[in-house]
Amino acid sequence: MDLILLVGIAVALLVILATLYFLQNKNKAAGEAKPAAAAPRRGVPQRAQEGVPRRAQIARNQRNRLQQNAPAPAPEAVAPAAAGDSDDDEENVGADGARLPQGAVLNEKMGAKKRAKMEAKEQKRLQREHELQEREKRKVKEAKEDAERKQQEEVEAEAERKKLDAERLAKEERERKEHEEYLKMKAAFNVEEEGFEEGDADDQESLLADFIQYIKDNKVVLLEDLAVAFKLKTQQAIERIQELQANGSLTGVIDDRGKFIYISQEELAAVAKFIKQRGRVSIAELAESSNNLINLTPVQSAAGGDS
């Protein structure tokens, strides 16, 4: 029993000693590794020592991601792409023949694309501004033309209105003067008529005989002249002629031109005889024969011609 206990104690001591020895060796190795890691290694870049990827690696990773995200190129674009790669390789070489970092080349390309995009946007903006300015100019021009046209129309309308007003005033003035003259003539005729009516019967008979003789002598009498000659109104002269025709003292016709044509009884008989002899007579034949059968020459003119 004592032997087994002693063996167990010995085994436990051995295990404890082995564990302590193992831990001591591990701590010693770790202490030696830290100073070695802290010291920089010659010929190795700092970024590599720190485990940071190089710029070329970053650019390559970015290019790979862009190629993965980009759509597949067309077959005819494969050759230009290959040529572009060779151009990129040539562009990666600097002026002194040294190869430029891939990241720097990528940044330059990205700047050119962005610059081209910005230039295109600026060009579109300028184009829009130019179109807007042209549109504004057209609007201003059209508005100016409309204003000028309206002004011209207003001027023409004003001129037309003034013209109509002037014509209206002239017409009113002319009518006023005619009315005044008519009133004056009416007053004069009334005075003359009163003086004529106040005469005695002998004077009236003498004037009536002169009236008839005046018509017979002139053959063709303008009614206005007849009225003025005997100080009558034109309507009064017409009424007096119609009364004389009704009682047989005068024979003749009043035409549409305001004239009385005296035709004697002998001339009427000659015209009636001509129509009776010919039977049916046209108006043209009757007019031609009337010129021969009816004498329209005034008595004074005929007497002057005979002398």
UniProtKB/Swiss-Prot annotation:
Substrate adapter for ufmylation, the covalent attachment of the ubiquitin-like modifier UFM1 to substrate proteins. Required for ufmylation of Atg9; protects the nervous system during aging, possibly by stabilizing Atg9 and supporting its function. Pfam families: DDRGK (PF09756). Residues 117-162 have a biased composition (Basic and acidic residues). GO terms for molecular function: ubiquitin-like protein ligase binding. The keyword Transport does not apply. The gene is Ddrgk1. Residues 32-162 are annotated as: Disordered. Interacts with Atg9; the interaction is transient. The keyword tRNA processing does not apply. This is DDRGK domain-containing protein 1. It comes from the Eukaryota. It is found in: Endoplasmic reticulum membrane. Keywords: Endoplasmic reticulum, Membrane, Transmembrane, Transmembrane helix, Ubl conjugation pathway. GO terms for cellular component: endoplasmic reticulum membrane. Belongs to the DDRGK1 family. The chain crosses the membrane at residues 3-23. It comes from Drosophila willistoni. InterPro entries: DDRGK_dom-contain (IPR019153), DDRGK_domain-containing (IPR050899), WH-like_DNA-bd_sf (IPR036388), WH_DNA-bd_sf (IPR036390). It is a single-pass membrane protein. Residues 32-43, 54-83 have a biased composition (Low complexity). Residues 1-2 are lumenal. Gene3D superfamilies: Winged helix-like DNA-binding domain superfamily/Winged helix DNA-binding domain (1.10.10.10). Residues 24-307 are cytoplasmic.
